[in-house]
């Protein structure tokens, strides 16, 4: 109910917003209490156990609360985030599917040399040569792996804003003529490097996007990945304004892939027909991707589900400021993260889908040593375990819901970290259809399969 269709777009009254905030905060607190109860650590102050909530192995940069200056055996650096919290970025931690790893904090900071060189408006990273314009947006980005210029049009991460007065429903609708009204906004107020080391560089900027509203943002470039992330805090005090972040790319392709539930949908990225023209605003979940045969750029986010795509341009919708029925509903502080990920291959599970999951699902951090046995894993890269839940009508059983994510055929083998008595294939209602002989499954493109695991 807290995700009801009148709550998500802001089309509810003020008291509902207030009640929902309290209820969600209470739900999150109870979830943390349950995690602490089910996964107790020994409380060792200088150690943490990291648990991977994903069904595939990961080795991306991990972010946890800093309890020391370094991490024993791993490249690391500390920084203060936009909330004023002291955090640590750690690289090189390999987490198996649903598995864990222990990290020990040290009093000695990592002394490895920085992988980045900033000279005026030019930034050199292990993956790209970047040039900033006077507003702090990325005017040029050359991929070192291909020598290719990626920017064509507005600089990457240009903020654009338009008047947003819908003809009918204030918070529900976006009218087609809004596209003609977008113009760059953002007066750069401050800009500084707040962290630079062997793991990443963080450039913190603050813009005024109007007389009343500001954006503060960390641009994060990584030594281990071509991804550029944007950790964003908006102080929003606008009415009937629509804000986007523009990424006008030099890619030439005839479609965009956008994630939906249990898969993705491919749409035209041109405006030739009336149907295509009506898709001036489309939806996505964790990613949208423009890919040629052997190169592409994914736009990844953690909570922003609307965007516009036209030829090589992707523009992520950051905020829509309707005033009815709650004129205060959108006012104040908003937090989000988004990123661009250039990849030197076409669209695949490894190039886009898995990094998008990693961006959205941070590992659980348990204080001290915690005894964690990996639940299960699947060996096909394009098969994802999307859900793990208790079985509705059986004790000593749980449900795995898996799906094929890339639009391809797959043979997949399940591996379990515990003894299994019986496996069966179920429908979505958990009604058994057949017993599973062994641990092998086949998947058609985007097929969802539900497995009952008895132990």
Protein language model features and the residues they cover:
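Metal- or metallocofactor-binding catalytic centers and their adjacent structured scaffolds
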Residues: 1-39, 44-46, 355-359
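C-terminal (or distal) subdomains of carbohydrate-active enzymes
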Residues: 33, 37-455
């Amino acid at each position: 109910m807290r995700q009801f269709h009148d709550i998500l777009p802001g089309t509810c009254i003020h008291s509902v917003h207030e009640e929902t905030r309290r209820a969600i905060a209470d739900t999150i607190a109870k979830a943390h209490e349950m995690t602490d109860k089910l996964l107790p650590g020994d409380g060792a102050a200088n150690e943490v156990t990291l648990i991977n909530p994903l069904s595939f192995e990961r080795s991306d940069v991990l972010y946890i609360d800093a309890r020391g200056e370094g991490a024993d055996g791993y490249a690391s650096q500390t920084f203060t985030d936009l909330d004023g919290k002291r955090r640590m970025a750690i690289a090189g931690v390999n987490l198996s599917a649903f598995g864990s790893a222990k990290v020990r904090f040290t009093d000695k900071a990592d002394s490895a040399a920085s992988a980045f060189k900033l000279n005026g408006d030019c930034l050199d990273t292990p993956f790209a040569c970047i040039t900033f314009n006077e507003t702090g947006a990325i005017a040029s980005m050359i991929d070192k792996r291909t020598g290719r210029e990626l920017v064509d049009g507005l600089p990457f991460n240009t903020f654009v804003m338009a008047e947003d007065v819908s003809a009918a429903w204030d918070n529900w609708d976006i009218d087609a003529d809004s596209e003609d009204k977008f113009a760059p906004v953002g007066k750069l107020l401050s800009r500084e490097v707040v962290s630079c080391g062997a793991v990443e560089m963080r450039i913190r900027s603050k813009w005024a996007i109007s007389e009343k509203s500001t954006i503060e943002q960390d641009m994060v470039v990584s030594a281990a990945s071509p991804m550029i992330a944007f950790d964003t805090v908006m102080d929003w005090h606008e009415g009937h304004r629509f804000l986007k972040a523009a990424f006008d790319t030099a890619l030439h392709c005839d479609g965009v892939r956008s994630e939906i539930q249990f898969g993705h949908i491919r749409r035209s990225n041109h405006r030739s027909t009336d149907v295509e023209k009506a898709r001036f605003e489309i939806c996505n979940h964790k990613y949208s991707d423009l890919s040629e045969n052997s190169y592409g750029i994914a736009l990844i986010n953690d909570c922003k589900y609307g965007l516009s795509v036209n030829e090589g341009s992707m523009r992520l919708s950051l905020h829509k400021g309707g005033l009815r029925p709650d004129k205060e509903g959108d006012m104040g502080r908003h937090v989000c993260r988004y990123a661009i990920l250039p990849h030197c291959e076409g669209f695949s599970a490894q190039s886009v889908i898995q990094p998008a999951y990693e961006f959205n699902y941070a590992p659980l951090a348990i204080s001290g040593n915690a005894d964690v046995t990996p639940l299960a894993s699947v060996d096909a890269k394009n098969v994802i375990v999307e859900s793990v839940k208790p079985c509705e009508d059986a004790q000593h059983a749980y449900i795995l819901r898996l799906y094929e994510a890339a639009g391809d055929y797959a043979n997949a083998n399940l591996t379990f970290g515990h003894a299994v008595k019986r496996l069966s294939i179920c429908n979505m209602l958990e009604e058994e259809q057949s017993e599973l002989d062994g641990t092998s499954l086949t998947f058609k493109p985007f097929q969802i399969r539900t497995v009952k695991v008895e132990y």
